[in-house]
Amino acid sequence: FGTSAASALGVSLALTKLIKLPISPLKAGQYAHIVEVSLGTGLGDVIAEMEKGLVLRIKPGAPGYGECEIINTNNDLYIITKTLSGLKTKDIITNPKEKEKITNVGLKMEEKFIKLPSINTFLNYSYQFAEQTELLNSKVKKVIDDLNTKTFGASMAMLGNTAFAITDNISEIDTDEYAISKLYTDGIKYL
């Protein structure tokens, strides 16, 4: 979900405005990135959250240093999710063996995705990533299998026991069982 990045970014932007710091939104994003990575709650989702819609991070780093490519989407899209339980991100990304596996598989999937970036290939390679890193468990897989019959495709959110899917048609989605969010493609909103 990028919850830790969103929280760090929200706090950074809010404090900047609240105490009238002479800091740009870009600089606030850079501070949020440092907090997220140094606390071990994520590996740099802030930059993606400061972009628009579905993005591919093509160069790691904080906003202003890293780079993202926006994946164009023609339709109104919805993200469908179901969370079964949490995972401690820090326990996984600070384990050298797990981090190496995640990095190696991630680079392989990224290389494939860059050749043909689309919603369908994103979902396909995301699922392959979850399987090959051995983060996917049978309970999340069961939810993914159900979502695959109603959407463009489904995978596992990183890092958590959460299934997600993307669709342009939510008529077959049980709103009592799944959370539904519209993909916002206009970029970050500053209030």
How would you name each of these model-derived features?
Residues 2-25:
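DPxDG-like acidic metal-binding loop motif
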Residues 159-167:
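Short cationic amphipathic helices and targeting signals
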Residues 27-141, 145, 168-169, 179-191:
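ATP-dependent small-molecule kinase catalytic core of the GHMP/sugar-kinase superfamily
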Residues 173-176:
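Charge-rich, low-aromatic oligomerization/scaffolding segments with amphipathic character
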Residues 154-157:
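Short beta-strand
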